[in-house]
């Protein structure tokens, strides 16, 4: 590549200068529960494990959602006998990696985007191919991998309208970064057009891999126990909620319980460590809340059941006939609606869903989902669907059929990756530099 743009040079300089300050920052994040205290060395580019022999694909997925979307892809690559290293950046994604990665696939927390940390990481793992998921584009990681001539591919690529507008103010930087990618596989046609406009040289609209991920599992015993505890009481659920949304849900519950005796509202905060705070909000509103993390099941007096545990959304989506998807009444961009749609739930969401705009648009158009703009509309739609089983079931059926019609991204992605994966299975002619 030619000389780096000024903004990118400045970023690299500041990141290098910040390197000595990272121990203090990481220590603070450990106290906040945002880092794995026993694995901080990985954030500085050090490895706990040896590099496996042979060719190695490095796949980077920022967090839980991104990792979940590529689990089937990881399995298909590993089945070919190619080594796979997966990096993620959050404690919760590390937990998911431990639970769900195929045997033999290595997980490491991604190094902070400090040049010497990234170089240390690359020198140890020596990847033969790098796959970046969605939009987690760390400049030093991309520049250093490109400098080592590692082929770079963006998979499930996503650039929202808001991100696109922001990047236009740093056009030279994003053109440089995307120009280092051999291939960008976009999640939607809109993403493909935005990636091309920002300088990606080769873009294919392969589709959203999340649509091909199997529905999340639910342990039969746990499902039966929770179903038994709730019994025939009316139930609504809210998944992956963010601060500011739980108060609207609690207020909706207070307004609805007069019409729906025994109503249970199940709230699964996006970050489980916020569970106790959600319970306090309910108590302040005069409602009784119980926390799943403490082993509680809802009893006859429970109003708000807080599912502050990891890996149980599959259970929640199977239980609740209708689900509000969080991150959408507040300006977060929305959470992924595909899993509840696959499991037969009618879906509600707020207006702020730019992270999954095209999927929500398809669901809304088919009647599988409905938008609510505030707490009043949320309570009203909950009430309408609780009163009308036929309308709710029709919406759930439309949601399921919509996501089924949009599937196929996994095979298209594998087809696009085939030349690169085939190359890794050929005898090595020279050692990796």
Labelled PLM ranges:
Residues 1-433:
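Nucleotide-activated sugar donor-binding and catalytic core shared by glycosyltransferases
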């Amino acid at each position: 590549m030619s000389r780096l743009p000024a903004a990118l040079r400045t970023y690299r300089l500041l990141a290098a200068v910040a390197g000595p300050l990272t121990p203090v920052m990481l220590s603070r994040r450990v106290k906040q529960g945002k880092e794995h205290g026993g694995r901080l060395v990985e954030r500085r580019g050090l490895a706990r494990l040896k590099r496996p022999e042979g060719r190695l694909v490095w796949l980077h997925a920022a967090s839980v959602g991104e990792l979940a979307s590529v689990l089937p892809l990881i399995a298909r690559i590993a089945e070919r006998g190619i080594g796979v290293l997966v990096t993620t950046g959050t404690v919760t994604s590390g937990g998911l990696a431990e639970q769900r990665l195929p045997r033999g696939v290595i997980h490491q927390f991604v190094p902070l985007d400090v040049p010497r940390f990234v170089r240390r990481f690359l020198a140890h793992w020596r990847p033969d191919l790098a796959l970046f998921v969605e939009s987690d584009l760390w400049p030093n990681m991309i520049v250093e991998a490109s400098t080592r001539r590692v082929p770079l591919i963006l998979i499930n690529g996503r650039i929202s309208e808001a991100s696109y507008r922001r990047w236009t103010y740093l056009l030279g930087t994003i053109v440089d970064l995307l120009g280092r990618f051999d291939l960008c596989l976009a999640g939607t046609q809109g993403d493909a057009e935005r990636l091309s406009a920002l300088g990606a040289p080769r873009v294919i609209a392969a589709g959203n891999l999340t649509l091909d991920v199997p529905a999340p599992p639910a342990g039969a015993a746990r499902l039966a126990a929770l179903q038994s505890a709730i019994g025939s009481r009316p139930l609504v659920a809210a998944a992956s909620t963010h601060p500011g949304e739980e108060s609207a849900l609690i207020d909706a519950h207070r307004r609805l319980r007069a019409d729906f005796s025994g109503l249970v509202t199940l709230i699964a905060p996006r970050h489980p460590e916020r569970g106790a705070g959600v319970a306090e909000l309910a108590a302040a509103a005069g409602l009784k809340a119980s926390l799943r993390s403490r082993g509680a099941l809802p009893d006859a007096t429970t109003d708000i059941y807080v599912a502050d545990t990891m890996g149980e959304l599959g259970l929640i989506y199977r239980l609740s006939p209708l689900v509000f998807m969080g991150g959408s009444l507040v300006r977060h961009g929305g959470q992924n609606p595909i899993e509840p749609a696959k499991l037969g739930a009618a879906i509600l969401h707020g207006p702020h869903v730019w992270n999954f705009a095209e999927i929500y648009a398809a669901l809304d158009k088919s009647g599988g989902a409905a938008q609510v703009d505030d707490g009043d509309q949320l309570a009203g739609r909950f009430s309408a669907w609780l009163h009308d089983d036929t309308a709710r079931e029709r919406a759930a059926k439309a949601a399921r059929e919509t996501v089924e019609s949009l599937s196929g991204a996994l095979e298209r992605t594998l087809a696009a990756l085939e030349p690169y994966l085939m190359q890794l299975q050929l005898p090595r002619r020279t050692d990796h530099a």
